[in-house]
């Protein structure tokens, strides 16, 4: 297993893994945007799986820090906003991947929500890393 030796109890390692997943998400998102519709199944699958992995890892990191040190109100609030940004990113990405006549606002939202997700995730991880 590639990540067999990764100490997932280390918040720092989780932060680095989340950053790596974001690099994969953005790289394949960029490639998808460049390739245009219809989207490559391979590129879309990698993009989606990396997104799901990032969400799961971030959730597990929040859970771990909450169970071991407790979360501050600020960390919980930023975490909730991060979750909402992820939901917006996934929803707009899902609409785009369906194809057909998609309103331009959906494309615009899918350019904004991933950036918002990254900024909020970075803030979340900074707060979590200072806690853990």
Which ranges hold each PLM region?
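Membrane-embedded alpha-helical bundles that constitute the cytochrome b-like, heme-associated redox core
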Residues: 1-132
């Amino acid at each position: 297993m590639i990540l067999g030796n990764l100490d997932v109890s280390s918040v720092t390692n989780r932060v680095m893994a989340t950053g790596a997943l974001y690099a994969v998400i953005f790289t394949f998102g960029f490639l998808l945007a460049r390739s245009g519709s219809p989207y490559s199944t391979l590129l879309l699958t990698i993009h989606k799986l990396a997104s799901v992995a990032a969400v799961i890892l971030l959730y597990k990191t929040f859970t771990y820090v909450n169970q071991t040190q407790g979360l501050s109100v600020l960390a919980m609030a930023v975490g909730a906003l991060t979750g909402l940004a992820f939901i917006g990113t996934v929803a707009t990405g899902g609409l785009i991947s369906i194809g057909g006549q998609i309103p331009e606002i959906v494309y615009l939202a899918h350019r904004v929500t991933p950036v918002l997700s990254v900024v909020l995730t970075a803030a979340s991880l900074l707060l979590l890393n200072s806690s853990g």
